[in-house]
């Protein structure tokens, strides 16, 4: 049975596709500027991409900047993401530092949702998921393929693996090499809609895959990511344009 998740009155996995805006900044001044630019945009969730910070190697500084995001947008669900270089992020770091940072964010209870990379060691991942949920934070397990689109059955298998690890939300992003690859991702999303009980997020990246960011309500992807001031992944559509497109496609979905 498919279940939804409610975070700060935002229902994920039911009704209309929710829009998350990635927040990308280098330092405190940059962060303040970006926050002022995005605060009136039509989004549902803010994703703080802390791996873009120049101070990403300091847990204390990451916490301080996360607090600033929380203070600026107190009513928006906050997704904390620290994407490592091996999964397409900006900051290369060890497993030890990665999980130490996640633990600190979880213990701070600043985020509402925390991003955890699936292929970071099953024992450590399961422990982080349990710790997040113990502290009232939803665990989003994710995986990114920046060079290919796996077969449909492999995509579904990874989403199921995330659910089996205890995820509250399961996310995968893949890179298409052809239009057929986009269809593979959409078919996998539709299959996961039937097989995975937790909310699923999928996307086919780049210009070729942009249509997948608009088709969530039809195929079963619960959140789409739209750029505010700067893209955090290939193929992101501006938040305002994304909202307008979804308004046309999903009218009456609620």
UniProtKB/Swiss-Prot annotation:
CDD domains: DHQase_I. The active site is at 144 (proton donor/acceptor), 171 (schiff-base intermediate with substrate). The keyword Lyase applies. GO terms for molecular function: 3-dehydroquinate dehydratase activity. Its EC number is 4.2.1.10. It is an enzyme of class 4 (lyase). 3-dehydroquinate binds at residues 47-49, 83, 213, 232, 236. SUPFAM superfamilies: Aldolase. It holds the Pfam family DHquinase_I. Keywords: Amino-acid biosynthesis, Aromatic amino acid biosynthesis, Lyase, Schiff base. InterPro entries: Aldolase_TIM, DHquinase_I, Type-I_3-dehydroquinase. GO terms for biological process: 3,4-dihydroxybenzoate biosynthetic process; amino acid biosynthetic process; aromatic amino acid family biosynthetic process; chorismate biosynthetic process. The keyword Amino-acid biosynthesis applies. It catalyses: 3-dehydroquinate = 3-dehydroshikimate + H2O. Homodimer. Belongs to the type-I 3-dehydroquinase family. Involved in the third step of the chorismate pathway, which leads to the biosynthesis of aromatic amino acids. Catalyzes the cis-dehydration of 3-dehydroquinate (DHQ) and introduces the first double bond of the aromatic ring to yield 3-dehydroshikimate. This is 3-dehydroquinate dehydratase. The gene is aroD.
């Amino acid at each position: 049975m498919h279940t939804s998740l409610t975070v700060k009155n935002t229902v994920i996995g039911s009704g209309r596709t929710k829009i998350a805006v990635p927040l990308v900044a280098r330092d405190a001044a940059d962060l303040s500027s970006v926050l002022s630019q995005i605060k009136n945009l039509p989004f549902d969730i803010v994703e703080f991409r802390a791996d873009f910070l120049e101070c990403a190697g300091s847990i204390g500084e990451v916490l301080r900047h996360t607090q600033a995001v929380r203070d600026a947008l107190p009513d928006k669900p906050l997704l904390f993401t620290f994407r490592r270089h091996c999964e397409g992020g900006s900051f290369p770091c060890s497993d030890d530092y990665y999980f130490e940072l996640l633990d600190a964010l979880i213990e701070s209870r600043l985020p509402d949702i925390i991003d955890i990379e699936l292929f970071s060691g099953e024992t450590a991942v399961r422990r982080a998921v349990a710790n997040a949920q113990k502290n009232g934070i939803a665990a989003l397990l994710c995986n990114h393929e920046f060079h290919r689109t796996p077969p449909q059955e492999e995509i579904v298998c990874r989403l199921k693996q995330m659910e089996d690890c205890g995820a509250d939300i399961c996310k995968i992003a893949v890179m298409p090499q052809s239009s057929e690859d986009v269809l593979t991702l959409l078919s996998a999303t539709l299959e996961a809609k039937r097989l995975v009980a937790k909310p699923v997020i999928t996307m086919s990246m780049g210009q070729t895959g942009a249509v997948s960011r608009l088709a969530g309500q039809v195929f079963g992807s619960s959140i789409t990511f739209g750029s505010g001031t700067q893209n955090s992944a290939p193929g992101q559509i501006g938040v305002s344009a994304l909202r307008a497109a979804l308004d046309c496609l999903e009218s009456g979905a609620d």
